[in-house]
């Protein structure tokens, strides 16, 4: 079977469920990891650099991470991210690479990062594969973008500094044990558009039992959260 046909079959399987073949494991990245000192002006005209303190208020204002630090491959009409070698405190994924949109984070694509405190995904990303952020132990904040449709199993497994997650309107599917070992998470916002969410999306035995599930009344997320005995706040 030639490489082009194999890649096409793999993409079909990934779309069908984010399991099995899916995006393959990221290639070993031999790029030397360095930090940049780029500066981005915020709305308050204060400079945010990669040396700034990372807060809930400013993490989305950090400079975009240079594409040279990413391992990526073509997938469908754009690119999937398979790895990142940046040691900056914030990984701000670019919207496009080589003129094509970044549309997926592959399996373990941004996992095992020991320095990252926040991740910003562009609005072009539709798919986050399983274990995408696993063991990002210092990750506190994440922005998922407005086009996300599904997130795979164990995506935030071991992210024991993660404070909250807001899934965007239009999101459809949440995988198994997405928040395993997320010990300090305060709240998870889940829109009514999410209709596929398993009873074990949140593993209460190893997570914060006082987490708030913020979701509209009558939603699938409310039903599942109630079955797990989690606190529900209707929004």
Regions found by a protein language model. Name each.
Residues 201-205:
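A structural signal for leucine-rich repeat
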Residues 4-12:
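Sec-dependent N-terminal signal peptides
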Residues 1-5, 23:
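Positively charged n-region of N-terminal signal peptides that target proteins for export
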Residues 25-66:
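N-terminal, intrinsically disordered, polar/charged segments of Gram-positive cell-envelope systems
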Residues 54-84:
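Short beta-strand/loop segment at the start of cytosolic alpha/beta domains
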Residues 17-20:
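C-terminal motif of bacterial Sec signal peptides marking the signal peptidase cleavage site
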Residues 108-109, 130-132, 152-155, 175-178, ...:
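Consensus positions within tandem repeat domains that build extended binding/scaffold surfaces
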Residues 68-76, 86-103, 114-127, 135-150, ...:
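Structural signature of tandem-repeat unit edges
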């Amino acid at each position: 079977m030639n490489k082009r046909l194999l890649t096409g079959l793999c993409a079909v399987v990934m779309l069908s469920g984010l399991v099995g073949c899916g995006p393959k494991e990221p290639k070993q990245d031999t790029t030397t990891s360095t930090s940049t000192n780029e500066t981005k002006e915020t709305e308050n005209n204060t400079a945010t650099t990669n040396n700034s303190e990372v807060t809930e208020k400013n993490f989305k204002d950090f400079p975009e991470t240079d594409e040279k630090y990413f391992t990526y491959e073509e997938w469908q009409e754009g690119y999937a991210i398979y790895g990142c070698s940046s040691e900056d405190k914030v990984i701000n994924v670019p919207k496009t690479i080589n003129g094509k949109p970044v549309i997926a984070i592959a399996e373990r694509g941004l996992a095992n990062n020991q320095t990252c405190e926040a991740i910003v995904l562009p609005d072009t990303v539709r798919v986050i594969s399983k274990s995408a952020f696993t063991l990002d132990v210092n990750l506190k904040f994440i922005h998922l973008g407005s086009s996300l449709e599904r997130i795979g199993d164990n995506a935030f497994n071991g992210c024991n500094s993660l404070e909250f997650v807001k899934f965007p309107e239009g999101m459809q599917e949440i995988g198994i044990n997405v928040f395993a070992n997320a010990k300090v998470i305060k709240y998870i916002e889940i829109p009514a558009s999410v209709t596929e969410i398993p009873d074990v999306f949140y593993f209460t035995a190893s997570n914060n039992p006082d987490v708030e599930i913020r979701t509209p009344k009558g939603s699938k997320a409310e039903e599942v959260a109630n079955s797990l005995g989690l606190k529900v706040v209707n929004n």
